[in-house]
Amino acid sequence: WVTKQHKQYAQVLDVTRAAELRQVVQHADAIHIGAAVTLTDAFAALTAQWPQLHRFATRFAGLPVRNSGTLGGNVANGSPIGDSMPLLIALRAQVVLASQARGERQLPLEDLYTGYRQNVMKPDELLVRIVVPRPSAHEQLRAYKISKRFDDDISAVCLVLNLDIA
């Protein structure tokens, strides 16, 4: 969005070369997706746990965007038309923010946003990873995207349901 607003900055941080931010780490209780992991790789990790997300994942943006855009960028951007946020919120995802001065803090994704393209991140904080709990045995997840065109279109409606049927 820097180019759309014609802003100029003294420094710009490119997180895509930070190896720590490009990792998907599988833990027993959760998947940790680095902020610089491409959308393609992030959705591959998610569909490995939730195969029913495959169709939703292939409708997320166009292939060039999925191969170069990052999940952290999509989440931090906070656009209300972003399809990753409803999915990640339904999956009970948490975001990890890091500051050199204060260390890391973790919060539910829905608590990140305060308004249109606004969030609680401090000027010295960086979104470093998204933590997605593994599915429960009784979980039923469904994701739907309705748009005018099938390929590469913003959602008119994005609906994600995650029910724990015990």
Model-derived regions: residue spans:
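C-terminal structural segment of proteins
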Residues: 1-166
